Amino acid sequence: MSLSIRVNEKAFGKGSFKTSVLQDVNLTVENGEFLTVIGPSGCGKSTLLKIAAGLDGDYEGRISMNGREIKGPGIQQGFIFQEHRLFPWMTVEQNIAADLSLKEPAVRKKVDELIETVRLKGAEKQYPRELSGGMSQRVAIARALLREPEILLLDEPFGALDAFTRKHLQDVLTDIWREKKMTMILVTHDIDESVYLANRIAILTAKPGRIHKLIPVDLPFPRSRTSPVFQTIRQKVLKEFETTETFSFQEGSGI
């Protein structure tokens, strides 16, 4: 699976009210790659992810998967939002199955497997009000994986969680990626998270967002945040990120 992203321009508004959010973004994500996307606030990270998922078609450019143009959402793309968006009247297993019937043996088997994968064994019958934030996001991850998408797109899914839970779910996500060998693209504000998870990091400039730098992360798994190599890559990413932040400040200040 190769995902080709070309966004000549994405803008909101018309005429004198037009605001360009993304410009001249060209990116290819290879099969099995874990790409993280970082950049200043408002640079269009989440918008780019929604375009890649087929959730936003109002842009100039082309998104294709294995040469086939993506014109809307499909089962080949799984999407996880910043909020878990679980149905409050459904149990964990019902939320994972969503519109599919748990009475179907194949669905039942798949849901049970995913409950094991995201480490929710024993919580199958619980409702969202009984779950912690981390558990709720694990349900959302399992639901996104149910139809076995070719690519999983994640829009800051751990942003609202405490540090301990966040690190735990990063490990869960890494295990899923390594086991299923699927392609993942994750948007984040967290540089440590970006280095911990990714094969490659895309850094966007300030609005309008463009690709500022692509940085490979050549680290074996499992990774240690305290290792010298990890810290070296982190400092490299931070330096490039600060460059985009400085540019954003200068643009806004008229310097």
From Swiss-Prot:
Key words, A-Z: ATP-binding, Cell membrane, Membrane, Nucleotide-binding, Translocase, Transport
UniProt: ATP binding residues: 39-46
Q: What class of enzyme is it?
A: translocase
Query: SUPFAM superfamilies this protein is in?
Result: P-loop containing nucleoside triphosphate hydrolases
Q: EC number(s) on record?
A: 7.6.2.14
> Where is each ABC transporter domain found?
5-231
Checking InterPro entries in the record gives: AAA+_ATPase, ABC_transporter-like_ATP-bd, ABC_transporter-like_CS, ABC_transporter_ATP-bind, P-loop_NTPase
Which reaction equations make up its catalytic activity?
ATP + H2O + aliphatic sulfonate-[sulfonate-binding protein]Side 1 = ADP + phosphate + aliphatic sulfonateSide 2 + [sulfonate-binding protein]Side 1
Q: Which domain of life is it from?
A: Bacteria
GO molecular function, a single term: ATP binding
The annotated topology with respect to the bilayer is: Peripheral membrane protein
Q: Which Gene3D superfamilies match?
A: P-loop containing nucleotide triphosphate hydrolases (3.40.50.300)
Q: Which is one Gene Ontology cellular component term of this protein?
A: plasma membrane
Subcellular locations according to the entry: Cell membrane
Subunit organization: The complex is composed of two ATP-binding proteins (SsuB), two transmembrane proteins (SsuC) and a solute-binding protein (SsuA).
Return the similarity comment. Belongs to the ABC transporter superfamily. Aliphatic sulfonates importer (TC 3.A.1.17.2) family.
Its biological purpose? Part of the ABC transporter complex SsuABC involved in aliphatic sulfonates import. Responsible for energy coupling to the transport system.
Protein name (Swiss-Prot/TrEMBL): Aliphatic sulfonates import ATP-binding protein SsuB
The species this protein was found in: Bacillus licheniformis (strain ATCC 14580 / DSM 13 / JCM 2505 / CCUG 7422 / NBRC 12200 / NCIMB 9375 / NCTC 10341 / NRRL NRS-1264 / Gibson 46)
